[in-house]
Amino acid sequence: MNSTMSDEPDALSVVNQLRDLAADPLNRRAIVQDQGCLPGLILFLDHPSPPVVHSALLALRYLAECRANREKMKGELGMMLSLQNVIQKTTTPGETKLLASEVYDILQSSNMSDMDNVNEMNYRRRKAQFFLGSTNKRAKTVVLHIDGLDDSSRRNLCEEALLKIKGVISFTFQMAVQRCVVRIRSDLKAEALATAIASTKVMKAQQVVKSESGEEMLVPFQDTPVEVEQNTDLPEYLPEDESPSKEQDKAVSRVGSHPEGAASWLSTAANFLSRSFYW
């Protein structure tokens, strides 16, 4: 990479931009169909910086939510092998191992029979737990209803708050119903998520639970903040002057509303990836 150009994007800013675009369901097909972005995300899985690897996995997790993408993603050169390497590498943080295993499970199950699918996913989970070690327990899912989660800038604030919590593996926003589905380590309390979201000063979280009759209920968290262990190995995800919040509406709507704009940005990302990895 040519570091002499002051306007040259670095690896973290590029992968974060891809992650933010992949967070919007309208963009997922276009990103996977682009010739440079999916191979680039695979190469990022072998990047020496843990935040780059984790952000690439979040992007892949978003892309894999689109069923139409899964076969192409699974068949992309190096995808499954790179995911295995992340899971098995001894230096990979525990949350990153779990996220890589989750993406692997989704892609591996894309063309299996139901029984093969169950057996393979159970095997992957056992293997991930082995590499995580005895101090890391199985992940759990927490569904949050977030008052105030009503636009893209609020979503970015919420995302930044969650990324700072040690033990958060992945999350998916459901903006239409003001919800966020969060995968966390089982030893992390859901109250920590509420504390982090409350720290934004403009949003407040309640937990969505099901009653015995199957009806959904909103359960408020205690008003007393709990101590949140910070994810010290991750930098602030984007520097303030590069934060996507100011341009989020424009950036996220590009694929659906302005294909030429999205193509231009994806081309820029692909050129960066080409210069960085293929010489």
Swiss-Prot record:
Where are the disulfide bridges? none
| ARM repeat spans | 36-78
Q: What is its main location?
A: cytoplasm
Where are the membrane-spanning stretches?
none
The record's subcellular location field reads: Cytoplasm; Mitochondrion; Mitochondrion outer membrane
Stretches with biased composition (Basic and acidic residues): 243-252
Q: Which GO terms describe its cellular component?
A: mitochondrial outer membrane
UniProt region (Disordered), positions on chain: 236-257
InterPro entries named among the record's database cross-references: ARM-like, ARM-type_fold, Armadillo, ARMC1, HMA_dom_sf
Arranged from A to Z, the UniProt key words for this protein are: Cytoplasm, Membrane, Mitochondrion, Mitochondrion outer membrane
The UniProt GO MF terms for this protein read: metal ion binding
Pfam families in UniProt: Arm
- Entry keyword annotation includes Mitochondrion: yes
PANTHER family the UniProt entry points to: ARMADILLO REPEAT-CONTAINING PROTEIN 1
Briefly, what is this protein's role?
In association with mitochondrial contact site and cristae organizing system (MICOS) complex components and mitochondrial outer membrane sorting assembly machinery (SAM) complex components may regulate mitochondrial dynamics playing a role in determining mitochondrial length, distribution and motility.
Q: How does it assemble?
A: Interacts with mitochondrial contact site and cristae organizing system (MICOS) complex components IMMT/MIC60 and MICOS10/MIC10. Interacts with mitochondrial outer membrane sorting assembly machinery (SAM) complex components SAMM50 and MTX1.
Record-given protein name: Armadillo repeat-containing protein 1
Supply the gene name. ARMC1
